[in-house]
Amino acid sequence: MMSKSGRVAATAAAAGALLLAACSNPPLPPPASERSSPTAMVEAIRAAGAADKSVVQVAPLRDPAVDGFLDQAHAAENAGNYQDALDRIDAALKLSPDAPDILQFRAEVEILLRSYPAAEADARHSFMLGPKVGSLCASNWQTILEIAQAQDRGPDIATARAARDKCHKAGPVRM
């Protein structure tokens, strides 16, 4: 049997442990890199653009040299050479600096390079220059949404989600 002083000591020790546990900080959330991989983020962005079946879609006409740089950029990205892909995209942008689809592609590659501020800036710039409806619009806002989610920016998540949803423009009802 435990003596009275032993019970008091055990109770005090238990109370002290509870007090220390109550004062500890909650565990930190995992870093953004563990919550969402850049590859998964880009897949979600591209899926948002592909999923938008708006009545309005914009297809740019461009210099064949720009298409050559973009083909090289896609090949570099597929090979996992993200910096080389970014360099090719930058070369395309020198020839076509206000092309919103190229800016969006650069944003996606910047995500793969974990350059989130640059990616968000390019997605916003692409949106400002591009159509306000359709797949490119949806990709722009999905980019901003993915970055906001990765950085736990709650209010920005809701704003980006709502803006992305506004990109869809349904066609007229035909009877």
Q: How should each PLM-predicted stretch be described?
A:
Residues 102, 136, 140, 173-174:
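TPR alpha-solenoid repeat register
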